[in-house]
Curated annotation (Swiss-Prot):
Zinc fingers typed FYVE-type, residue spans: 170-230
Binding site residues for Zn(2+) 2: 192, 195, 222, 225
Feature: compositional bias, Basic and acidic residues: 307-319
Protein name: Vacuolar protein sorting-associated protein 27
Gene from which this protein is expressed: VPS27
Biased composition annotated in UniProt, kind: Polar residues: 473-483, 498-507
Organism of origin: Candida glabrata (strain ATCC 2001 / BCRC 20586 / JCM 3761 / NBRC 0622 / NRRL Y-65 / CBS 138)
Amino acid sequence: MATTSSEEFSEVIERATSESIPNGELNLPVALEISDILRSRRIAPKDGMRCLKKRITNTTNNPNTQLSSWKLVEICIKNGGIPFLREICSREFMDTMEHTILKYDDSDEVVELVTTMLYELYLAFQNDSQLNYVSRVYDKLRQRGVKFPEGAPISSNVNALFDSKTPADWIDSDACMICSKKFSLLNRRHHCRSCGGVFCQDHSSKSIPLPDLGIYDSVRVCDNCYDDYDYKKGSGSQGKKRKHRKSHRHATEDEDEDLRKAIELSLRASNSSVEPVIPVVESEPQIPAVEEEDPDLKAAIEASLREAEEEKRRREEHAQQQNTNAYPQQFRPPANELTPADEEDIYLFASLVERMKTRPPSEILDDPQLQQLAQKVFASKPRLGNTLNSKIQKYNTLVDMNGKISHIMNTYDNLLEQELRNINLSERFNVPQAQADPYSQYSQYNQPAIQNNTSQTNNVVNNKPLSQRESEPQYTAPTDSQTIESKAYERQLENLVQPPSNVNNERVASEPPYPNEELNDITSIQLNSERAGKYEENAVPPGSIPYPIENDDQDETTRTKKNDNITNFDFPTVPARKLPENNVEQVEDKPQDSQEEALLIEL
């Protein structure tokens, strides 16, 4: 048995109490279906009560729908069973009934119906301890002066109004109620939908519908309930066999009579319905002179009459087919719209008028067929106006919708263009990625072009082998005048060598700003003069130690201090432009020449 959700149950309630039903009536078959759903417990009683209450609260502004909703509640109360009655008699629903009786002023019929229902519930359950809230609401309304129909005949047999059979509550047990077998993993338990007992598979394998419980699908029942229903069907069928034999003859006759009556009613309805707009016109030549003089007009009129007769014959055949197929109602076009026959009359009248322009007025006035056609066309003028207005309204609506669609499309295109523009801007201004080796960039761009001459000479000396370094004389620190001259020499070299202008990793050798010969001459002369002055001032007499021991210790201590920091490196200078190779060779060869000159001066 399939269950029903609250949404589906609410839809069925709306169909039963539709606003299209006049005078507060309801759809009775759908209402009985709702009561069967409640009685068979396909929906929980509380959920069913809340769906009905929701429909009542949502239709307070419509008296007809409100009346039909309360009528549906009355049917459900009398056919829903005891579990549903308990929810109706609860405080949640009784407060709604009390509020309707006291404060609903739109319809006296609704107030009277709700008052009668409350009084019936009070008479039926005034002695029930579980449903005593009905008595409290009744006493409260009596104190406020509400009048109840106490003298009505409903009080004599009110308990029979709520006597409806419902499925029994399920009983729990550990053994079958017929064979007493214990339930286990293999021997599963099953409940009977009729009596609510617990049975094994062997004694609950049958399934039948239970219409007296509101269950029209085949459900599982036990063997005892199946035998009871089978016996009831057998006893009922034996008593009806004799009556069935006697009434079988009359059944066929009744069917024939009903069919005959239905055909007669359909024929009457078709005759009373709207006749075709163009009736049959008798083709009696009243004015033979006009017909002889105008054969084209005569042929056109005869053709229109033949078409009208064929149209009438086709409609009669169609009506007969509908009657044989048990469709008594015929399709009727709207009264305020043009029919195809009206359109044909208008076109025919227009063509005839165009042809009659050359005829004298007397012939036009004497033609009775043309006069009848003119009357039909003039009678269809209001319908033509209504049709024209409806078409104009539809056209304006479509034009408005087209304008809205175009506006929406333009707005959507602008949004897309803005998004694409934002994406292009974000891609254009992305942050470049950092290089993998930061020291390479530092060595290329952040180092000065040329260091001072002391660092250059030290690098040249350090690159020599150890034996050659020991044979060369040691030098002392330069004086102030020598430092000034070295700084001036550094400025000259910086002016000669320009820093890189563009940030590229490629190093392109460029031509020096001056010819190589002049640059070689200048650098060789300056180096010779400076080193000659150094050796003359710092000449050491024979027999003396060139360097004190303390100075060696100090150099070692300073050298160890510098090496304490691992990252304290003196990176070699990478010039931005290629230096002439002759200068380097001259710098490396000059110390030997200066030594020879110093020895010659001493001699």
